[in-house]
Each structure stands twice: as C-alpha cells, then as structure tokens.
Amino acid sequence: MSDREESGSPEPRSKIEEDLESDEEVKTIKSEEVDKTQDNVEDEDDEEEEEEEEEEEEEDDDEEDVRQRKKPRRERRNQFLDVEAEVDEDEEDLEEDEDGLIGEDGFVAEPDADEPDASDDRFHREMDRRREAIAEEDAERLADEYREKYGRSTANKYRGDSGVIPQHLLLPSVNEPSIWGIRCKPGKEKELVRQCLRKKLSLQKSRNPLEIMSVFQRDTFTGYIYMEARNQQAVTVALKGLVNVYPQNMILVPIKEYVDLLRATKSAETELVPGAYVRLKRGKYGGDLAIVENLSENGLEVRLKLVPRLDYGRNAEAGIDGKRKRVARIPPPRLFSEQEASQYDPRNLQKRGPNAYVYAGDEYIGGFLYKDFKITLVNAENVAPKLEELTRFNSEETDGIDLASLAQSLRKSAAAVQFQGGDVVEVSEGEQTGVQGTVISTHGDIVTVEATTAPLVGKRIDLPSRSLRKKFAIGDHVRVISGNFLDDTGLIVGLEDDSVTLLSDLNKKEVTVFAKDLKKVSDIGGSHQVGDYELHDFVQLDALHVGCIVKVERDSLKVLDQEGTVRSVTPSSITMKLTRNMEGLATDSNGSEIKIGDTVRETVGEGRQGAVLHIYKNTLFLSSRSLGVFVAKAFKVNTIVAKGARTQSNSQATGPDLTKMNPAVYNARPGQMAPPVMPKQGGFDRLKGKHVAIGPGSQHKGCKGIVKETTDDIARVELHAPCKVVNVLKHQLRIYDDYKKTYLSYMEFATPRGMRSGGGRPGGPPGPGGPGSGGQTPSWGGGGKTPSWGAGGKTPSWGSKTPSWGGAKTSSWGSRTPAANAGGAQTPAWGAMGNKTPSWGASESRTPAWGGAKTPAWGAAGAGSKTPAFGVARTPSWKSSSAGTYGGSSSRNKGWEDLGSGNSAPTPGYAAATPGEMMGAPTPGAAHHPWEDSAPTPAAYNDARTPGVYDPRGSGPAQAETPAAWSTDDAPRYDDSPTP
C-alpha cells in the first residue's frame, strides 16, 4: 500500500482498496457464518467423529499452509464459496489491469496444479454418507448407542433430586443444637407451642430476637414441650412471660434419644365435624355414644350431645360433713325427667326455657345432655354405633336416624364388616366402583373377590374390606349374624343404600339392619333362649300358677299356664325354673301311671293326642307336632304309648307306684336321708316368720329374706332384694337363730333341742342347745327299761365293765342301793315294801339306817349301813352328818335337814368304788328343802313330783335333775367327792 501512495495516484487506488476491503469483509463474515453452521452440524455428531475431523482438518491446514503461506485460513473457507458470484460486474474492466494487485492481495484463490481435483467436494461427500448411514440405522439401535455413549458421561454428574445420602450421616451429633424438655400443664402443650411461635415472629426483626431454632410437642408425651436451642439461656428467655409452663426444672434430652423423639409417626386422629358419632373413653359416660355438636375455637374441647345417666340424688347418702357420697353403681341411660328432678332434688334444678333446664351445673335440652368435654376424652375411631343406641336419640320415631351418615361412619371401621365365603359383594369405592362379585377368601382386611360383572368377569381381585359392601336382592332369605337381632331370620322386603328391611320369621315384624350384619341362608331359625330360659321350659309364675314356655321373643316369653291361658311375661317376672324332680305324678283314666315322654290321648272333647312334656298335679302339658303345646287333665286321657317298654296291662295290674306319691321320699337323692318334718303345734309351722338365708342348691343362693308360707318341703321366701317372693326347698334354707346369733341348717332347726349335739346327756344338765333330758320312762329325752340310746344293754357300755345304766340286773347308775329307774333289777326297786334294805322313811330296820354306821364318818351321828347310804361312804365324805338314805327321816314330809347344797348327792360318784358310767348319779337327786320341785319318785317331764329337766325358757317350775350334777351357788359339787 505504501508503494501505491508514492506513485502519484492515491485516490483511485484508495477507492479500489476500500471496495476490495469491504468485499473481503462481507465474504469473511459469510465464511464465518458458514463455519458456524458447519460447527453446529458437527456438534450434533458424536464426539469421536468430531475429534477425527479436527485431526484431518489440521493435517489439511498444514498442507495448505505449506502451499499458500500468505493466506493460511482463507483456503479452507474458499472451498465452500462461489467466488465468481460474489464479484461485481462493474469491476470486470479493472481485473485485467490489476491482476497483479489482486494476485498480490490473494483475494482469489488460485488453483494449485499439484492439488487433486476431488479435494473441493471430499468433505461434502463424507457428510452425505454419514447422514445416509444415520438415517438408515434402526431407531432402537440408535437409542442403545446413545445410552451407551452418553450414559457414562452423565452418570457422574450430580443431581439434587437423585442424590443418595447415607442414613448414618443424618443422625444428630454433638455439633447439633440441644433439645430441652420443659414441663407444662397437661392439655396446654399445643397452645404453648403457638405462643412461642408468635413470640418468635414478633421479635424476629427486633434488637433482641429469640435464639431458639424450633419448638414442638408430642402427643405421646403429655405435660412436656421441647425447644431446640444452643444454650439453656435462650430457652429461658423464650419462656419468659408465658403461663402454664414450669421452666424451673428443664430436662436436657440425650443425643441418643433424638431419633425417637423426632421420629415422625402417622397420625391416627380423625377429624371431628359436627354430627359425627363418637364415644367417650372413661368416666361415668365411658363407652356411651355421643353426637358432636360443636368444637371450641382452640380445638381442645368439643361439645357433645348424649343421653344422660342420672339418679337425681336417690342413691347418694349424706355423710357426716353433710356432703353426699357417690356410689359406684352407674345409673342406666335415660332422658332427663323434670318431674323426677323436682321431686327428689329440686334445689339443683333451674329452668332456662321451654324444655331447657340446668340441673347440677349441666345443661339439658329436650331431655339430652349438652356438655363440653376435652378432646382427649373423645374416641372417634371404630365407633360402630348400633341401631338400638341410636333409638335413644330419637325415641319417638326412627325416621329421624340418618342411616346414610351412620353407615359412612361404620365404613371407617374395618373390624365392623365381616365377610364370609360365598357372600355377594359390591365395590363401593375406588377404581372398580360398581363391580359385583363373590367372596372367595379373606385374609385380615384383604378380601379376594371373583368378579361377576363386566369388564372383569371371571377375574379374581384383592380389595380392602372397607371398600366392599354386601349385596342383596328383595326376596332373599337372610340371617342376622350380629347386632341386636342376632340369629333372627327373615325375608328382605326393602333396600336402601347400606340398610336392609326384612320381615322377621319369628314375630312377623319388620326390622331394619345394616347389610354388613346379614348373611344369605335357606333355613328358618331364631333365638330359642332369653336369659336362663329356653323353649318348653317348665317355670313357676307365682304361688298358684305354673306354665310351659311356648314361644321365645326378643325381650319376652309366651307361657302357657295350667289353665290353658297364654301369658306374655318377662324373664325377670318368672319366679323360678322347675326341674324334673320337682314335678308331680299322675294317673290316667284307667289308673295307669303317667310318666314324662308317654303318649296319651284325650277321652273327651276333641280327642287330641300328644307327648307328655310336664306333669303338674293332675294337669298334663302335652306337645303335638300339629297342635303345638296344649293342656289336658290326667283323668281325661288314656295312655297309648308308654315310655320305657311299659305295657298298659302291667300298669293296670300293678297300679301306680304309691311310694313316689310322697315328695320327701321321691325327691331324695340316693344315700341321702330325707329332711325331718317340722313338728307342728296347733297347725302352725315354726319356720314361718323366720329370717333365713338361701344356701347352695338354689338359683337364689346368697339372698336373704323372711319366710311367708310353707308346705311340707317348700317355703315361700320374701327376698329383701330384689323384692319378690320365691319358692325354695326347706333343706336349702339357713335359719337365723336369735339365741345363738348364727344361722342353723334346716336339719338343726327341725331337730328338737334336747336331741341336738349341744343338748346334754339324758338325765343330765341342759346343754347350750336346750333343756336336758330326763323324766318318766320311757321319755324322748331319757332312757327306759329297754336300753336307751346311750347304753349298751346287758353288754357293758362305755365307761364301765359292769353293766351300765338302763338295763343291768344290778342297780343302775353306779349305786349299790337300788335307785330309781332301776327297773328289772333283782334288788327291789324303789317303792318295794319289805325289802331287805330298808325303804325310805322306815324308822326301824335290822340294817341300821342312816343313824349309824360301822365306819364312823366325819360328823356322823351313828349313821351306818352295810350298804353305804346316801351321804355315807367308806372314806368319810363331806357333810357326812347329813341323812344317809334318800328321804330317810322319821317323817315323810320332812326332807333333808341340811340346807346346804341340794343338787349334789354326797354319795361317791365321779370316782365311786362301784364301776359305773362317767358322772353317773347313784341316787335320784332331791331338793334341799320341801318345795314342789322335789319328789322322790321319778316322773315325767314338767312333773313337779319327779326329778325332771330344767327348762331355760321358764315355761314351768324348775325341776331338780336326777341326779343333780351342778349348782349355781358355791356349794360342793357332785364330782368333788373324793375317791373312797
């Protein structure tokens, strides 16, 4: 350029240069655009091909640089440019003049003779071949190649959503903030968390923000909230000014417990909405059904509507301090009664409006209780309300019950639905809604169903039980498998969503139940039992009526009595159930015995025929397949078929077993002695009016009451609680004894006092049970000439080898002197005149009387006898100065002169030389003084002249015992005499 400027023509050359330079810039820009296009195409190819092309291009560039060192890069660009098309036609004249200039500039690429002709389009052909090969490749193969080539390069790239972090790196460490547990008032945990959140937000942009990271509470840890902070001071500042929290004793949670404390658990809480059914967890209304009326603003309390349980203060007793004590018995649920409240507890009753009252601080509207409960006391899961519970909320009409909402709440409980194999079901929710099928099997909450409708006909699918409901059609015969109408059967007459109306086979009434409680059956059945009573049981209705149960209903029984009348009674009104051994016996018109199970036919009237179910006196309860149960008189029937292979001829020949007519013998168990019959005085039974307790063997065991009426073996007892009259066998009673302050068995009560174990021995002192025995022979309390109950007769009995009292040839009762009651003895008995031994009252005798004795006794006045008399012994005994012979004075009217002890005989007794019974009295005792209760002759009971028994009841004058064994004073006793 500098040479041209020096030649003297700068302007034309400058213009040409400018034009050439502008053209060169345009072409350079276009070539760059082409290069960019080529680069874009090459970028679309794989990286390996791109590297190969770059290597080839570098080799070509090296060759071109050698050939054209003046323009190394333009050679590559000129291959893709049409140079001739870019030159302006106006400049054709200048081309010849300026060939050298153009050649020097190198704008036009001159073809090199050494370069081959195909070098210009080599790259074009290569590109075309590659594009054709790519187009011909299979798309699936190409995708595999791309995945293989580029998958390795992209696998190492980090993606935030696909990164996997080891679990141990998520565990808390010592570098994490600490968690502090703070005690608070139970039920205020959530409220305190909200207060801390508001305080944190309000102080966030202030000069002193709270330095806590988080605040939370757990439902499983009541009474605590937890704060996350770096130090304890930050927690104290955050809690400053809050109520219902106690920051004095904070708990630092250990690091190893962070995981359990912060583990997220799925909440099982059910959202409470007005109208939902719930149950209370505990308290007086624990387990009762309630309806949600409203929720409080803080969400901690809920207002419920429920049926109240009130006794209106009748079962509460006032204590010493005037406060009422609550009893443990919970009243039954009943609607509020304003009349009862005003009658029994008017002080706590206030009227707020029409049919609205406030009683004892609670609000009652329309008879229902409206009360606020803490939400923690409410259970909204598995409520499963029953229809009988819902009828309490609408006692007037059942149309008010929302069965649809009730069924919706029941679906939430999987345990409320029971599916069995063969049930026809329908899918009620999910993608298969409306599909019907048959249940094949069940496994927990999963039910396997074989579809019977399109588009899944024949396929088996597993579905959760909560998404299924049973499907029935009108006319199906079903059975109730749960609920209040359990085991009832009937015909479906109406369908409405999940509720089914059926006509019961038992009472021909329509009942409404849920479809989940039904099962399709073909048989007809029903409940045959209510409480303890079943169909055809024989029961006692009252004192005069018995009957047979002929029909069992839901809450009542149909009973046919002995008069042929059918009564409708409740189980609680039945007195008792009669057993087979309590039934009577009867004979037919031919005199044949009738037994239970025999088949008989009426001889008069309609001539009905049936089998004997029960027998009551002369009334038969018969059962016929076509007539049911009916009543007939025994003397108006004939036996057709006898039970137990008995024949009518044998029955007529032998007649009835009269031994079974006695209930005491017929009802006795084998090996058991029949209870004794009570002795009656003037037709009055002493058992009447007694306080008794019912013992084992009766269904009323443990109950107490008063005996009102009695028969030979049955007593009618009026119970204290419950207040009713029942029939009880006498031997099952325990009679209260006012004397002993204890209960006696019927056997003890019926046994006379003298014969009881505590009555004393015959002729001895009275025991604790009653008066002693003694008196005239024979007597119920003493012995006789025949050996009595305590003696062994001629064989020596207990206590003596010498024949004992009551039948010995020697004098009885251990006395050598003939004593009273010594009948049959060779020694003359009492009253025999002319005996060798002087009789009593004899003033003169060969044998010295009591006035003298060979062995002088202490204080004796010459009393003596070969046979020691009364009061005289070989060894001087005490008071030997007394008369030796019973009544041995010169005057018969004068008794003993000694006024000492009158009930004890001074003859040696307890250790007498003559063998005798233990503590046997040798001589009939007499009184010390001539009273009316003293007589030398043994007499009967209550006879003043004969030593008898002592009656503690004071029914007559006191009688001296024979022999007397004790004294109530301090006089010497009979058993105190020394051994001779």
From Swiss-Prot:
Stretch list, region Disordered: 1-120, 751-980
Taxonomic superkingdom: Eukaryota
GO molecular function, one term: chromatin-protein adaptor activity
Intrachain disulfide bonds: none
Pfam families given in the database record: CTD, KOW1_SPT5, KOW2_Spt5, KOW4_SPT5, KOW5_SPT5, KOWx_SPT5, Spt5-NGN, Spt5_N
Cellular component, GO annotation: DSIF complex
Low complexity bias spans: 880-891, 905-916
InterPro entries assigned to the protein according to its UniProt record, in alphabetical order: KOW, KOW_Spt5_1, KOW_Spt5_2, KOW_Spt5_3, KOW_Spt5_4, KOW_Spt5_5, NGN-domain, NGN_dom_sf
Compartments where found: Nucleus
GO process terms (BP): mRNA processing; regulation of DNA-templated transcription elongation; regulation of transcription by RNA polymerase II; transcription elongation by RNA polymerase II
Gly residues bias: start-end ranges: 770-793
Start-end of Acidic residues biased regions: 40-65, 83-102
SUPFAM superfamilies: Translation proteins SH3-like domain (SSF50104)
SMART domains, sorted: CTD, KOW
Keyword annotations: mRNA processing, Nucleus, Transcription
Function: The SPT4-SPT5 complex mediates both activation and inhibition of transcription elongation, and plays a role in pre-mRNA processing. This complex seems to be important for the stability of the RNA polymerase II elongation machinery on the chromatin template but not for the inherent ability of this machinery to translocate down the gene.
Family, per entry: Belongs to the SPT5 family.
Protein name, entry field: Transcription elongation factor SPT5
Organism: Yarrowia lipolytica (strain CLIB 122 / E 150)
Higher taxonomy: Eukaryota, Fungi, Dikarya, Ascomycota, Saccharomycotina
